[in-house]
Amino acid sequence: MASVLLPQLRTGWHVDQAIVTETKRLVVIRFGRKNDRQCMIMDELLSSIAERVRNFAVIYLCDIDEVSDFDEMYELTDPMTVMFFYHNKHMMCDFGTGNNNKLNFIVDDKQEMIDILETIFRGARKNKGLVVSPYDYNHKRVS
């Protein structure tokens, strides 16, 4: 299986530019440590769907050990966090976990992740700041 190499955001400036300059697609950023098991699993999933979602989403990786600028602002305390942005606006999604700011658990199904990204993108285009996930992850609640 050929996987797409996802672009790395190596500085805070690169993260800002990715969020600010994309005007048509959802910006998806996986924050975490590249050698963390959860990150590796999620990176594989994200790289496997990148080509399928390229028309409405762009996916980036950001190592929080290299870029610590956003740790406090986005509360990046989990080993792996996926966040969503559209038109320079942080998009929130209710996954049923109590934390609408970020996805901080592993989604292990490609179609589920595509559906989540598409739902957030459709909500963002309608100027909704918070959308409800098509799947309930209450059982994956992370403290």
Curated annotation (Swiss-Prot):
Transmembrane segments: none annotated. Disulfide bonds: none annotated. GO terms for biological process: mRNA splicing, via spliceosome. CDD domains: DIM1. One of its GO terms (cellular component) is nucleus. It is found in: Nucleus. Keywords: Acetylation, mRNA processing, mRNA splicing, Nucleus. Its main location: nucleus. InterPro entries: Dim1 (IPR004123), Thioredoxin-like_sf (IPR036249). The modification N-acetylalanine is found at A2. Pfam families: DIM1. Belongs to the DIM1 family. Essential role in pre-mRNA splicing. Also essential for entry into mitosis (G2/M progression) as well as for chromosome segregation during mitosis. Component of the U4/U6-U5 tri-snRNP complex composed of the U4, U6 and U5 snRNAs and at least PRP3, PRP4, PRP6, PRP8, PRP18, PRP31, PRP38, SNU13, SNU23, SNU66, SNU114, SPP381, SMB1, SMD1, SMD2, SMD3, SMX2, SMX3, LSM2, LSM3, LSM4, LSM5, LSM6, LSM7, LSM8, BRR2 and DIB1. This is Spliceosomal protein DIB1. It comes from Saccharomyces cerevisiae (strain ATCC 204508 / S288c). The gene is DIB1.
